[in-house]
């Protein structure tokens, strides 16, 4: 039986046909891509995916995971998967899927989840299936699992414990309009500043705060200028494990089944890894005296202020049915 061999380099992808036929005895090779090194949670999730596919398929198959952005960045990975060349599987931010689905970035929006338990329930209940279906139809890229789990909090140059203290707080937010709208609704004064300028902006009192996951706070050393971490838990990341639909259609049925099963399980594994590492990093930074975690007492009240903005945003992008189900899930 002749099987497909996936192109293993960008140079080859540019000149080769979508696939080449291999010797009947040669096992299939699938290519993955990730921006990070082996220590990152995304790598660990994709390696688990490979391990599980081998387990469930039970036949010879090879995987090549291209690390450290050697095949570009996540935006390029998604484009390659849509085209059926160079990259067969990856973990990609929903923001890079917006060309094909207006609702895609919504699944990574702020104030969508009540807490980590609610986030996990939403993913386990497969409430994001309409978004996945739209992306599969329009981009021919399958969302076979959901990793992520980094919780974003506000790092500030002063303690912030409630809505009164957070009122008027000048905080850097991401460029997507929904971030400024929701933070304004919560009473803050959001400002869009380039990520690599946040440290100096806080140091020079242009802003008083920013928001990120523990890994970002650690890597950028934001704790040096903003050592107070308000535990707002305003966003919990979702990072889909993606698989090229064009590649998937060429696979034998038993391998397709293995890919689907492995994707779901690897996503759950990735969520556990990232959420636990998030906590470990916070504990380590706090123990070393780099930052202090500050409980935020008005988390529920803040979400109540933001919910109408999120509801309007969901309706605007055609995700109102999904939003209603997420809010209703207990």
Please describe what each predicted stretch is.
Residues 5-15, 23-118, 127-330:
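N-terminal secretory/targeting leader peptides
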């Amino acid at each position: 039986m002749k099987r497909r061999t996936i192109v293993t380099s960008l140079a080859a992808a540019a000149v080769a046909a979508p696939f080449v036929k291999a010797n009947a005895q040669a096992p299939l090779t699938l290519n993955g891509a990730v921006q990070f090194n082996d220590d990152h949670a995304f790598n660990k999730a994709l390696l688990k995916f490979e391990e599980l596919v081998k387990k469930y398929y039970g036949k010879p198959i090879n995987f090549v995971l291209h690390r450290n952005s050697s095949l570009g960045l996540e935006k390029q990975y998604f484009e390659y998967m849509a085209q059926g060349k160079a990259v067969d599987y990856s973990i990609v931010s929903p923001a890079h899927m917006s060309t094909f689905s207006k609702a895609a970035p919504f699944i990574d929006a702020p104030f969508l989840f009540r807490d980590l338990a609610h986030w996990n329930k939403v993913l386990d209940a497969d409430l994001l299936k309409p978004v996945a279906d739209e992306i599969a139809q329009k981009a021919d890229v399958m969302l076979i699992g959901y990793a992520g789990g980094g919780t974003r909090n506000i790092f500030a140059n002063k303690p912030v414990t409630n809505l009164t203290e957070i009122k008027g707080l000048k905080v850097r937010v991401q460029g997507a309009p929904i971030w400024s709208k929701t933070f304004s609704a919560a009473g803050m004064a959001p400002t869009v500043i380039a990520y690599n300028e946040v440290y100096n902006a806080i140091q020079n009192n242009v802003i008083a705060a920013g928001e990120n996951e523990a890994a970002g706070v650690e890597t950028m050393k934001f704790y040096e200028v903003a050592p107070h971490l308000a535990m707002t838990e305003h966003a919990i990341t979702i990072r889909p494990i993606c698989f090229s639909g064009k590649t998937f259609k060429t696979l034998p049925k038993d391998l397709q089944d293995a890919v689907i099963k492995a994707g779901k399980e690897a996503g759950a594994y990735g969520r556990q890894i990232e959420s636990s590492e998030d906590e470990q990093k916070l504990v380590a930074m706090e123990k070393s005296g780099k930052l202090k975690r500050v409980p935020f007492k008005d988390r529920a009240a803040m979400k109540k202020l933001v919910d109408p903005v999120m509801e309007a945003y969901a309706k605007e992008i055609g995700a109102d049915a999904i939003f209603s189900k997420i809010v209703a899930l207990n």
